[in-house]
């Protein structure tokens, strides 16, 4: 049975950047990795209502810089920057170094796979029909400018006794093309019937780095001479 490779993992270092960018000696590597995990767990839990897509961590010169990509920067910053200062102090406490927190606003949340998956999960928890939630997400993404989107939900859909998976796709979603800019994410929806898993693939176009795609002209077939001449 054919399985699909993780769309982000196969493109890592080609068209997808790492979400942690730092170098450490062998003695410090495990501590840095563990503190990265703790920072992400804390921020994800603390900023549940802030529509956080991803958290990028950098470690320049014995300090840590955390960039929070969110669709609702006002919730992260808080009144007069009080909330972000609390986050900065706690991140500094976890890592034991000076911390800096930057906030990047996501202008088009309909084209962010993580935010789309979280939105569908929240709708399912509010007992919205899963087909309606899927179709709404697909229509919004295509309307904003996606070249293709695929949404899959799996579990006890509609409270059915037997779990199953259903998916809906519109446009192109080329999984094997490495230059394709595909945003992929997952989410879980905890309903009264059990956990429903959500997967979202969004195709935003091809990453060509300024190259113009070559368009091959169809070759003209040589004319055949009629027989008998």
UniProtKB/Swiss-Prot annotation:
One of its GO terms (cellular component) is cytosolic small ribosomal subunit. Residues 39-107 form the KH type-2 domain. Keywords: Ribonucleoprotein, Ribosomal protein, RNA-binding, rRNA-binding. Pfam families: KH_2, Ribosomal_S3_C. GO terms for biological process: translation. InterPro entries: KH_dom (IPR004087), KH_dom-like_a/b (IPR015946), KH_dom_type_2 (IPR004044), KH_sf_prok-type (IPR009019), Ribosomal_S3_C_sf (IPR036419), Ribosomal_uS3_bac-typ (IPR005704), Ribosomal_uS3_C (IPR001351), Ribosomal_uS3_CS (IPR018280). One of its GO terms (molecular function) is mRNA binding. PROSITE patterns: KH_TYPE_2, RIBOSOMAL_S3. Part of the 30S ribosomal subunit. Forms a tight complex with proteins S10 and S14. HAMAP family: Ribosomal_uS3_B. Binds the lower part of the 30S subunit head. Binds mRNA in the 70S ribosome, positioning it for translation. Belongs to the universal ribosomal protein uS3 family. This is Small ribosomal subunit protein uS3. It comes from Shewanella frigidimarina (strain NCIMB 400). The lineage of its organism: Bacteria, Pseudomonadati, Pseudomonadota, Gammaproteobacteria, Alteromonadales. The gene is rpsC.
